[in-house]
């Protein structure tokens, strides 16, 4: 596509530019509110000395957003509801893989992240491993050749790992001064109740 046309479409807010750097074009079905991003390679999420923790998965792509648009990177609803779909790799005494279990659900969350309109480096998905437990699914396959020392969670290449939702971003100026307290509802965290 012509560079000037691309520039014009981005300036009008009708398109964004995607630079694949080893990643894959995000998937969008029909009028879905978000695009799905793929894991570009197998990624180990936890190590034996860190049962829980956080990190990021590099999606190996860059994005140029229109002015006034941000991109929220968030969890897919199925992962939030049922747990992230991963494989388990069982590691033996010699640090070699001695078994596996595929298609399990683990308590791993994709944390909310924001891509700013002026960010051009690689986009990633932030994650948090909440537990070292996992639940097999009806599609799980299991093989274990010998005793294992520990196991790790592996997100397989091609997994739709997170969603990206575009949103308008307002950037008002900050003015130092006293707040208008006429319509202050008061309270704070949890003050509104649950019923």
PLM feature spans:
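DUTPase catalytic domain/fold
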Residues: 1-195
């Amino acid at each position: 596509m012509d560079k000037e046309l691309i520039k014009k479409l981005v300036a009008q807010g009708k398109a964004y530019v995607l630079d694949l750097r080893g990643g894959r074009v995000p998937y969008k079905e029909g009028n879905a509110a978000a695009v799905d991003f793929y894991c570009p390679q197998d990624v180990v999420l936890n190590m034996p000395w860190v049962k829980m923790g956080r990190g990021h998965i590099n999606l190996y792509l860059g994005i140029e957003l229109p002015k006034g648009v941000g991109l929220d990177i968030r969890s897919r609803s199925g992962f939030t509801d049922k747990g992230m779909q991963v494989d388990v790799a069982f590691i033996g005494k010699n640090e070699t893989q001695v078994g596996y279990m595929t298609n399990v659900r683990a308590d791993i969350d994709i944390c909310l992240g924001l891509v700013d309109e002026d960010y051009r480096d690689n986009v990633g998905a932030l994650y948090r491993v909440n537990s070292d437990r996992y639940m097999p699914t009806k599609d799980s396959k299991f093989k274990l050749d010998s005793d294992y020392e520990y196991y790790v969670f592996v997100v397989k290449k091609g997994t739709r790992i997170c969603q990206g939702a575009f949103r308008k971003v307002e950037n008002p100026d900050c003015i130092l001064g006293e707040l208008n307290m006429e319509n202050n509802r008061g309270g704070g965290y949890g003050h509104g109740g649950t019923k």
